[in-house]
Amino acid sequence: NYLISKKLVKQFYTPYSCSEETLKRAHSENYIKHIKNKTLDQNTIKKIGFPLVDSVVRRSLVATGGTVLASKLAINYGIACNTAGGSHHANFEGGAGYCVFNDVAVATHYLLDRGLAGRILIVDLDVHQGNGSADIFKNNKNVFTFSMHSKTNYPVKKSISDLDVE
């Protein structure tokens, strides 16, 4: 691999499918069940923007597992990333904006629940506001959500992050 041969990275890791137990801290059991069974209502499927098929469900579970894995690796090695992550529009009750599960929220809860971190800063520099992350952590004093985004972009109705820069 080019990145390894140039010593830009030491190793690549293969993500795993995120467990239902881990997902439940950031998403409702009902929503998770409907995603896994592919029985989600058409309105929520439309909000997500993807058809609810096996490949989308699998990709969403593995991408979320990848962010949890990257968060653990970052704790151990000081830095790690998951290039398939960043699904910041999904909230507790459902997905939106091409985001099925909020992988950053899932990984944040994972680290906090296991005492691997005491406080977490979520820095979201996407052109779209991280509304799902803001909603999930709006009452959590151990998580600070910072979103720098376009004021006139999706989502039309913005959530309130701890700090929004438009």
Task: Locate each region found by the language model.
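HDAC/HDAC-like amidohydrolase catalytic core signature
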Residues: 1-166
